[in-house]
């Protein structure tokens, strides 16, 4: 007979004495893509499982359990992020043992409420990395993907079809520029906006977008970030994994090589504002 054990942990808001729950910590708007706090954490765990090949090894029909992780797992905040622990049998066989996932604050910081950011002990490096990820999302709206859009509300201008932008807190083109300025310098903001020609435009006082996503560079894998600070300025270094196509496996394979990119920034009102953004994807 296999012995059974269970892990339980609780976190408290020391300013109120109440339990810390994800619902209490989440912002109403979610992150820039509209992902809730729970969704942001879920996607990181999902990616960890995929990267390690665990879904092929011994996990079976686990996705619904992951999506409901606040109910089915034990959550514990640490100095590095959130530890999510599933006991035996929940998402894997007993022999696999408890499944423990560490999710860095930088992966879900942008979906936290402002109050949550004041009570969680998040390092400056993690907040800078979170700002970098937000800036990368904004970059992608101009050079790789589409921003959140309401496809049920459309308009046609000069033969081009536009969808209503569904970016939280952004109603107009000027509002989009203001959002950019939270994360990049005015020069970069104007460069990004200028690269789109008429893709983003105000129609009847609302921001509309022409769909034009191209997808990413498939020869680049995941990346890691480190931030070096010197007072109110610093440099974030992004180290990207290089991939090559494997004809036999019909898949992209790790070459064992990496490339590094540097992003200088200045801290403004607690946010990292980047003055260069050589994002390679």
Predicted regions and their residues:
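Short beta-strand edge/turn micro-motifs at domain boundaries
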Residues: 14-21, 235-237, 256-281
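Compositionally biased intrinsically disordered regions enriched in Thr/Gly
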Residues: 1-130, 134
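Hydrophobic/aromatic beta-strand elements that line small-molecule binding cavities or substrate pockets
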Residues: 8-11, 222-227, 259-267
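Exposed beta-strand-loop-beta-strand "reactive/processing" segments of non-cytosolic proteins
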Residues: 1-4, 168-173, 182, 232-242
């Amino acid at each position: 007979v296999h012995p059974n054990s269970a892990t339980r942990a609780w976190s408290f808001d020391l300013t109120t004495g109440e339990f810390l729950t994800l619902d209490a910590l989440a912002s109403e708007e979610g992150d820039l893509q509209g992902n809730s706090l729970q969704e942001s954490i879920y996607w990181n765990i999902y990616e960890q499982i995929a990267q390690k090949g665990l879904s092929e090894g011994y996990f079976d029909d686990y996705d619904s359990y992951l999506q409901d992780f606040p109910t089915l797992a034990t959550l514990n905040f640490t100095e590095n992020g959130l530890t999510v622990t599933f006991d035996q049998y929940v998402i894997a066989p007993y022999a696999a043992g408890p499944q423990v996932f560490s999710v860095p604050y930088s992966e879900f910081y942008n979906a936290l409420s402002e109050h949550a950011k004041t009570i969680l002990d998040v390092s400056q490096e993690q907040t800078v990395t979170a700002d970098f990820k937000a800036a990368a999302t904004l970059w992608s709206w101009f050079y790789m993907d589409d921003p959140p859009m309401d496809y049920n509300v459309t308009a046609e201008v000069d033969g081009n079809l536009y969808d209503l932008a569904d970016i939280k807190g952004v109603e107009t083109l000027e509002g989009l520029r203001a959002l950019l300025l939270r994360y990049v310098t005015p020069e970069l903001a104007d460069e990004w906006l200028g690269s789109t020609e008429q893709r983003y435009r105000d129609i009847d006082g609302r921001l509309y977008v022409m769909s034009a996503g191209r997808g990413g560079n498939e020869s680049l894998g995941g990346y890691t970030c480190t931030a070096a600070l010197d007072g109110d300025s610093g440099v974030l270094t992004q180290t990207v994994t290089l991939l090559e196509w494997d004809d036999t496996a019909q898949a992209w394979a790790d070459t064992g090589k990496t490339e590094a990119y540097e992003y200088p920034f200045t801290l403004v009102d607690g946010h990292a504002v980047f003055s260069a953004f050589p994002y390679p994807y």
